[in-house]
Amino acid sequence: IAWALLLCGAALMFWLDMFDVQIMAQTLVNGADSFSLLAIPFFVLAGEIMNAGGLSKRIVDLPMKLVGHKPGGLGYVGVLAAMIMASLSGSAVADTAAVAALLVPMMRSANYPVNRAAGLIASGGIIAPIIPPSIPFIIFGVSSGLSISKLFMAGIAPGMMMGATLMLTW
């Protein structure tokens, strides 16, 4: 995608007779030169370290002890684990993969329908871009000039309400 955008922009500049290699290089460097954008690779690194260290299993163990004993408790565990993972890593895909790898086999062995279990875990993964720290919040804040801390504060209540709604409808 990045190469396609770069080539389209270069073709447009060439067609409009505005092609200057120095301006293009300077724009590329200035676009990526942001202190706030450094948070994104560090979130990914933190997620990899947590996954390698076995923190994902421990994160699932906490909701398991809190609500796992209730009827339908594995569903509640899935949503709570997704919310906890979202508050740590900021990546929806990584959170969903970690929670699904641990909980879908457990839900299958507890005779939950596989499509319903996978749907719940996938729906829980959608909470990750809302609950801070969120990679999409950082990208949106940097590109629009909004305060990232205010975006983070604005995401707490909706993320909690989404999680509560998922647990109520399970």
Task: Describe every region a protein language model picked out.
Residues I1-W170:
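Alpha-helical transmembrane segments of multi-pass membrane transport proteins
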